[in-house]
């Protein structure tokens, strides 16, 4: 479904992504881990065109994202993203936040958009807050609304960029529960996270990145039980022993 072919990414002289070759398949849950500054979020943001690549090819459902003539907005309809800091519109209600993109981009009627928004709010256990404003919600509640907003576009894949790192500990579990539910339903998900318990329980594969490189791309159990790369071993021992 998504292919990285010899991807390089520079910010000026800084080499952010180095020769990335990855394939993400339909229905997979892939967790991407690694130390800060390793290129995880950059790699994720390349998938929906928030970041350009410097060299290589990025294919989504066989379409080269950066080829001349590619309509990037059409591609983006198939790629949902959930950010670390929710990015909800503060002056709009929960329901309005979710209805906005389907009405503007997918040209849904107000009635259809509302019906779908309520369906996805129910899925993330937030239907009772549909008329609330983001400022009246906890971080965890806002993140669940952001997930519903991503789902409302009917994407083929959902990208999660550290979705729990800005949350209070007591609200993290609610967000992870929603993500686990989506995984069980067969949603294709690529998740940048430090939540190792979630990775162990839900991921089909784990990708470990450091200094802009993919150092491990392995089936979850074998990665956690027997990481081969020395930096992956050090990273796991630090994060699991804390």
Feature annotation, model-predicted:
Residues 1-220:
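ABC family nucleotide-binding domain
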